[in-house]
């Protein structure tokens, strides 16, 4: 799915993100394109199911993983009409910094963006939302 890499490149171009990904969540449940060498490159179908699944409460208590990286869910509006986003924060393991992550849901794909250190989640949410809306309006 080489054509999807341009969407990842577009998400990365302003310099506030350290990685981005486009991930299918319907019939093609895998990473379609991602920043090379990043955590998102390793997102699994099980992790995708956790994000889009019917249980919208369990991950608030237990957290979730993205590419085996432990994360906390801050806000879940993935299935709220007009929003379709989720705000996540990575957990520190061994004292490394934590990072904000935003997920936007289109019709068949999820848009993931992870900010650099100190990048506020609100800007990431807007970026994920805008790309997901564009893809949703384009039939994806």
UniProtKB/Swiss-Prot annotation:
SMART domains: PROF
Tissue and organ distribution: Isoform IIa is the main isoform and is abundant in brain. Isoform IIb is a minor isoform.
Presence of the UniProt keyword Chloroplast in the record: no
PROSITE patterns: PROFILIN
Cross-referenced Gene3D superfamilies: Dynein light chain 2a, cytoplasmic
Cellular compartments annotated: Cytoplasm, Cytoskeleton
GO molecular function: actin monomer binding; ATP hydrolysis activity; phosphatidylinositol-4,5-bisphosphate binding
Location (main, coarse): cytoplasm
Keywords: Acetylation, Actin-binding, Cytoplasm, Cytoskeleton
Family statement: Belongs to the profilin family.
Subunit and partners: Occurs in many kinds of cells as a complex with monomeric actin in a 1:1 ratio. Interacts with PFN2.
Protein name stated in the entry: Profilin-2
Gene name of this polypeptide: Pfn2
């Amino acid at each position: 799915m080489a054509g999807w890499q341009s969407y990842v490149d577009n998400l990365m171009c302003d310099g506030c993100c350290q990685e981005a990904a486009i991930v299918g969540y319907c019939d093609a449940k895998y990473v379609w394109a991602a920043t090379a060498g990043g955590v998102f490159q390793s997102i699994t179908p099980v992790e995708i199911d956790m994000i889009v699944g019917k249980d919208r409460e369990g991950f608030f208590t237990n957290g979730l993983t993205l590419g085996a990286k432990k994360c906390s869910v801050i806000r879940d509006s993935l299935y709220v009409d007009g929003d379709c986003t989720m705000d996540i924060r990575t957990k520190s393991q061994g004292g490394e910094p934590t990072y904000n992550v935003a997920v936007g849901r289109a019709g068949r794909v999820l848009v993931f963006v992870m900010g650099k250190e100190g990048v506020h989640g609100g800007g990431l949410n807007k970026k994920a939302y805008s790309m997901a809306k564009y893809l949703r309006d384009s039939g994806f």
